[in-house]
Design a protein with these regions (language model features):
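Conserved alpha/beta-domain cores
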Residues: 1-56, 62-73
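Conserved, mostly hydrophobic/aromatic
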Residues: 11, 21, 57, 79, ...
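Glycine-rich phosphate-binding active-site loops on the catalytic face of alpha/beta enzymes
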Residues: 18-29, 76-99
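C-terminal helical cap(s) of enzyme catalytic domains, especially alpha/beta-barrels
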Residues: 93-115, 243-248
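Nucleotide-binding motor/catalytic cores of P-loop/tubulin-like NTPases across gene-expression machines
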Residues: 164-166, 172-209
Length: 251
């Protein structure tokens, strides 16, 4: 609501993430302000690396029709281009007649938009708002290396509490982030972060054998021998300790 928007920065400082619920927002603010607020909320969440979900009426017509309107397709596309980590359906899947088609349509649009994202511009903008920490420096370096090296097809981030993967996600790399964690709850939490594919591993000594595990994970997720991945982790291990990156060949 309006009060939440007015206090957005203080909310973001303590929240795990934020949702742009356009329906609720539209009850209290003028219609023409909703898209302005949406872009502003997404931008601020992106700047500090907190996941942001855009929701409500995204493919509303698909509750009764197998295809969306062109305006709805544009709405989904713009939510992705604005920087949403997640785009969410509600009634379309909870009560609509075409739930599978709605999810498929949203997926197709999102993937198409991700191909068009100006990754270099996004990275340069994110660098300006970075916290100038070791973890941000690692995230920037990982995203930059992925842009410069065509052979790099993915990032493998070993993460205990999820902060390493979220920090990399903040800088919007152009390849997927395989976030390897040994905790189921962390795996679930990372589902909302942009570009992150959370993977639970029960290989407890993975941090001392990360090259081998990274190759296994890469091949399990569609990469092939000869591709390259960027590995990042923290030594010694612990939440928020990311201080290492290396580029290795999948074998």
């Amino acid at each position: 609501n309006q009060e939440g928007y007015d206090n957005l920065e203080s909310i973001l400082s303590v929240a795990d993430g934020v949702m742009v619920a356009r329906g609720d927002l539209g009850v209290e603010v003028s219609t023409q302000l909703v898209p302005i607020y949406q872009k502003s909320i997404i931008k601020k969440a992106n700047e500090i690396g907190k996941p942001v979900i855009t929701a409500t009426h995204m493919l509303e017509s698909m509750m009764a029709n197998p295809r969306p309107t062109r305006a709805e397709a544009s709405d989904v596309a713009n939510a992705v281009l604005d920087g949403s980590d997640c785009i969410m359906l509600s009634g379309e899947t909870a009560a609509g007649e075409y739930p599978i088609e709605a999810v498929t349509t949203m997926d197709i649009i999102a993937r198409a938009m991700e191909e068009l994202l100006p990754y270099r511009e996004r990275l340069d903008a994110a660098i300006k708002s970075s916290n100038k920490t070791v973890q941000d420096a690692i995230g920037i370096s990982v995203a930059d290396a992925a842009l410069q090296l065509d052979k790099v097809k993915a990032i493998v981030a070993f993460t205990q509490g999820g902060s390493t993967a979220r920090r990399i996600s903040k800088f919007r790399p152009c390849v997927p982030i395989f976030a390897v964690t040994f905790t189921k709850s962390v795996q679930r939490k990372l589902e909302t972060s942009w570009g992150v594919i959370p993977i639970f591993s029960d290989v407890q000594n993975a941090m001392t054998n990360d090259d081998e595990l990274a190759s296994i994970i890469a091949k399990d997720n569609g990469l092939k021998e000869g591709d390259y991945v960027i590995i990042t982790a923290g030594y010694p291990t612990g939440e928020g300790t990311a201080n290492m990156m290396k580029i290795v060949e999948v074998k």
